[in-house]
Amino acid sequence: MQNKTAKFLLSLTFSISAFFPIEAAEIFNGRKVSAIHPAGANGSKILKMEETILSKSIKPETAYFYWQSENNLIMIKNGQSFSVDLASGKAVPTENNDKQNSIVPPEAENIKWSNNNSIAYTIGQNLYFSDSKNNRKLVAKGDSNISFGQSVSRNEFGISDGIFWSPDNSLIAFYRKDESLVTDFPLIDITTRTGSLKNLKYPMNGMDSEKTDLGIYTIADSSVIYIKVDDFEYDRYLTNISWSPDSRFILIQILDRSQKHLRLNMYRATDGSFVKTLLTEDNDKYVEPLDPVYFLKNSWQFIYRTANRDGYRNLYLCDTTGKVRRLTTTNADVRYIGNDGTNVYYTSAEISPVESHLFSISIKKAKGGKASFAEFSKIGTPVRHTFEPGWHNITFSPDYKYFIDSYSSFNLPFKAILKSCGNKFEKVITESYCPLSDYATGEVEIGTVPSADGKYSNWYRLLKPKDFDPAKKYPVILYVYGGPHSQLVKNTWLGNIRLWEMYMAQRGYIVYVQDNRGTENRGLEYEQAIHKQCGQVEMADQLVGIEMLKSLPYVDSTRIGVHGWSYGGFMTISLMTNFPEIFKVGVAGGPVIDWKWYEIMYGERYMETEATNADGFRRTSLMKKVNDLKGKLLICQGAVDNTVLWQHSLNFVQECIRQQVQLDYFPYPIAEHNVYGKDRVHLMNKVTLYFDDNL
């Protein structure tokens, strides 16, 4: 509501952090910890709303790293390109002279480069191929219902691409998406003189979905064949495409419409025929594939990631004969980073749920050479490569001799270090300054509260005003998201805090943020707790945090507000209507109102359909809760929202009219799901003033 080449590009987002020293153990053991920004003693400048959204001087910088070759590391920072010397770690400005861009048409989208500088891309619904001499060919021509080379399934299941080059650069696999049966939802463009209709293909829960196929284009003869997929009839998802090392086979993770059954199948690239099923997954709640398989260097063994086998997203070593052996054995979610044929690198939350660190595990024999499956269980002890507290993002060189460790922590805004894989070499490339050192910022506290069922510790952060006085009573704003694939509290700069939270604390509010069951990085049971009952366990967990706040002598329990967007908007209205005695004011943005109006892929995973989960849809529908709204509620939404349709909030408003329930409503006529630029300044001013006037 949410791939590896030599030119792997990593976006590094710098966060905000305090410099007050905190011991790592305090973060890890779940104790309540707090820090005061250095500006808390000296800073006097006051944040302005425009600054929190538009100003670059107080915002995290963004840098990008990619390896042009094994010995050529490029850093792009503030629009300037730098070449990084591997021996010294020094960055020297360079000319940004990318000749490859000259063969990319300006209207091209979904651009994918091969290793020999050919490209495949889309223009509109059509798929094209161009070689390095700019000889362009039309691969497949689409129309208003059919597109080629685009991402499918609304970017669920880890899908972000629609074009897949073979390792030998001779073949292009691509998605064909047919939306002929998908219902059109009307969006109105008011910027034209008489208004324009723009229909959106939106596969709504329980209705007809898009149909996907996978084609393969052979460059040598310009021929196209399609993979012959017979699994789960035609109502299924083709996810996470992978090529075999020799480019002869293609692997597809095929998921049925109910999302409870998955098959990893192998097909021949020459004619699309089925070869074999390598493995299967079944779960009575859902299976969610998020990664393609990753072949080991110079091997037919591959890495497969799933949470379905042991309860956490762990890595498994597999081969094309169907053998599967668990590779990582931690009770924490891990993410695959890469392999050099003898070591597999991954990041893991095993140190702490709010930390991400780099590890490796050996996949070679003790005396050298590759391990067989029989030997594998006897070898490989995880080795940790990052030790500084924080959230680490990793970019490896193509030969896996070096990696960039870019990270921030509660104490550190940002740091990027060039390291050798043997931990024998380390050079700091760049380190961020604190852009808020002149501003009046308050105390930030990070800690845990138990989940409502008592099984887990849920992390929170609490921001207090700069001039906090424990003898006073303060209003509280709960900022909430709470949905899948989110984690708002991390050991990043000031715990992942947002500038708007600082702005509100500056105005005299305590701002509270908490992760709950259903969010990511805590294992499958934690994540699946929301299945068929979205909003229910999330509210229960959030209320534990609210009760903790109410027990504090400086919290005014009669002045508690809540704000969230998207899933957070759904949570905001859910909390306002289920617990009107607690929440006085709410601001909901782009809220889901009834899951029957949400899209198939995400919605059916977590809520199934009305036919299979009628009670769940009834209990979670906010249309049934209108008469329970007692406090002040403002709903904001983009009128051309293509994620949560405008239909949601408009139906809620209409039901309020029918039941004579008052609320406040503000649409953003040309905004989609999120509101950007100066429009966002207007939005956040409106949100702020709504709390000022009513809380």
Residue positions per predicted region:
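Beta-strand C-termini and the immediately following turn/loop, strongest in propeller blades
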Residues: 37, 69, 74-79, 85, ...
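Predominantly five- to eight-bladed beta-propeller fold
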Residues: 42, 49, 138-163, 174-226, ...
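Signature of short aromatic-glycine-proline-rich micro-motifs recurring in repeat-based ectodomains
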Residues: 59-65, 108, 151-168, 238-242, ...
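Serine-hydrolase catalytic core recognition
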Residues: 184, 247, 393-695
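Beta-propeller domains
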Residues: 177-185, 190-324
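Surface-exposed loop and turn segments in beta-propeller and other repeat-based domains
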Residues: 44-54, 97-102, 136-155, 205, ...
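Short loop/turn segments that connect beta-strands within beta-propeller blades
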Residues: 86-89, 131-134, 218-222, 269-272, ...
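Non-catalytic accessory segments flanking enzyme active sites
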Residues: 61-66, 70-81, 91-95, 99-105, ...
